[in-house]
Swiss-Prot record:
Protein family membership: Belongs to the NAD kinase family.
Protein's name in the database: NAD kinase
Species annotation: Hyphomonas neptunium (strain ATCC 15444)
EC number: 2.7.1.23
Pfam families: NAD_kinase, NAD_kinase_C
Organismal lineage: Bacteria, Pseudomonadati, Pseudomonadota, Alphaproteobacteria, Hyphomonadales
Broad class of the protein's primary localization: cytoplasm
Length: 255
C-alpha cells in the first residue's frame, strides 16, 4: 500500500507549534498540493483556515485539537495517525457565498463555512430588509444583527444567538436575528439550502452595518446577498464515533 501523503498545518498556538516538527519527522511532510490529506493542528480556527484554502479542490482535512474551541477537531494523539485517518468518517460541508455591496458601490465577495453575519457598527440599532428568493419577507427588522448559518455553523455564533441547531445532513440554513427589538418576538426562520437571501440595510449612511463571512469583514455595507455555493464541497474527517452529526446531537442535550 502506498504510504499516505500528509501535509501538516499548525496554528500559532505554542502547543501546536511544539508538536509540528515532531509529526513531520515521524510521518514526513508534503505540500498541501501534493498531499492526500491535510492535518490541521490547533483549534477550530486552524480547521477553518485550512478549509478556506481548499475551497477549489475540497481536499480532506483531519484536525487534531491543540487549541481552545475544538468542535471540528479530533483528540490529539501523535501515534497511529495514518491508521486514524484511514478509518475516519467523512463529513461533507457546503460553504456559503457572500456578495456585499458597500456604500461606495464596491462589490466584495467572500466564502463562509459557519455563517455570514451582519452587525451594527455603532450604538444605533441596525434596520434590515429581508428578501428570500425574490420575495420580501420582512420590510424592517430592528436588531443588533442578523446571520445566515450552515448546519456546521449552527452550533457556533448561531447557537449563542439562540438559533436552532441543524443536523449536519439537513438541507437547511438558519436565518437568526441578534437581539431583535422589532418584531420583538421574531426568532428567525429555517430556509432551504438552495435559498437566496438578500438583506438590504435601511438608512445605511445613518445606521452603518458590517458584514462578515466567518472572520472576513466588510464595513459600511448597503446590501448583502447570501447563497450556498453548490460548486464547492469541503471534506472534514472525524474519528469513528465522534463524527460531526454525533457532536451536533450531543450539543442539543448539553446543559
Amino acid at each position: 500500500m502506498t504510504p499516505l501523503r500528509i501535509a501538516f498545518y499548525a496554528s500559532k498556538r505554542p502547543e501546536a507549534q511544539q508538536v509540528l516538527p515532531q509529526l513531520r519527522d515521524k510521518y514526513g511532510h508534503y505540500s498541501e498540493e501534493e498531499a492526500d490529506v491535510i492535518v490541521a493542528l490547533g483549534g477550530d480556527g486552524a480547521m477553518l483556515d485550512t478549509l478556506r484554502r481548499r475551497f477549489d479542490d475540497g481536499k480532506p482535512v483531519y484536525g487534531m485539537h491543540l487549541g481552545t474551541v475544538g468542535f471540528l477537531m479530533n483528540d490529539f494523539h501523535a501515534d497511529g495517525l495514518p491508521e486514524r485517518i484511514e478509518a475516519a468518517e467523512r463529513a461533507t460541508l457546503s460553504p456559503l457565498r457572500m456578495q456585499a455591496t458597500d456604500l461606495d458601490g464596491t462589490v466584495h465577495r467572500a466564502m463562509a463555512i459557519n455563517e455570514i453575519s451582519l452587525l451594527r457598527q455603532t450604538a444605533q440599532s441596525a434596520r434590515l430588509k429581508i428578501i428570500v428568493d425574490g420575495r420580501v419577507r420582512m420590510e424592517e427588522l430592528v436588531c443588533d444583527g442578523l446571520m445566515v448559518a450552515t448546519p456546521a455553523g449552527s452550533t457556533a455564533y448561531n447557537l449563542s444567538a439562540h438559533g436552532p441547531i441543524l443536523p449536519i445532513g439537513a438541507k437547511l440554513l438558519a436565518l437568526t436575528p441578534v437581539s431583535a427589538f422589532r418584531p420583538r418576538r421574531w426568532r428567525g426562520a429555517l430556509l432551504k439550502a438552495e435559498a437566496r437571501v438578500d438583506i438590504e440595510v435601511v438608512a445605511p449612511d445613518r445606521r452603518p452595518v458590517s458584514a462578515s463571512a466567518d472572520n472576513e469583514e466588510v464595513r459600511n455595507i448597503a446590501k448583502v446577498t447570501v447563497e450556498t455555493d453548490p460548486a464547492r464541497t469541503l471534506k472534514v474527517l472525524f474519528d469513528p464515533g465522534h463524527a460531526l452529526d454525533e457532536r451536533i446531537l450531543r450539543e442539543q442535550f448539553a446543559f
